[in-house]
Design a protein with these regions (language model features):
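A short Gly-Trp-Pro
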Residues: 1-128
Length: 128
């Protein structure tokens, strides 16, 4: 948001999704987190030093979320050996975000009105 932290991604996203898990609801203070999931090796911080906050997470075991120490914006989280989740609203052009699925709808709030055209999964989509 403020530009104190910058990152780049050198590969196409693995996928894009809306995560409705309780962890995402709490950290965004909203219904879900819009996530761009990219290959871990393609993600690089190019400016600044993010702060991190970690919590236990049913989704990834332990979720380490990076945020800007200046403005507090959540930037990324859910890092695994395979990939890195990036909060879509932190992209330079958030209109590039095109979610493929809604996941963890088992935790979705009753007031959360999801796009009826997107597939919905109680937890994770089946692995291909």
């Amino acid at each position: 948001m403020c530009g104190a932290i910058r990152y780049e991604v050198s590969a196409r996203p693995i996928t894009m999704f809306n995560c409705h898990c309780r962890d995402c609801q709490r950290t965004t203070v909203g219904a879900f987190t819009p996530v761009v999931y990219v290959p871990a090796k393609a993600f690089k911080i190019t400016k600044g030093s993010p702060r991190y906050y970690s919590t236990p997470s049913e989704m990834v075991g332990h979720n380490r979320r990076g945020f800007c120490p200046e403005c507090g914006s959540r930037l990324f989280g859910g890092e695994t050996e395979r990939g890195q989740g990036i909060t879509a609203s932190s992209l330079d052009d958030p209109s590039l975000f095109k979610p493929k699925v809604n996941m963890w709808i088992s935790d979705a709030q009753p007031w959360d009105h999801m796009d009826p055209n997107l597939p919905k999964f109680e937890k994770y989509p089946p692995q291909r």
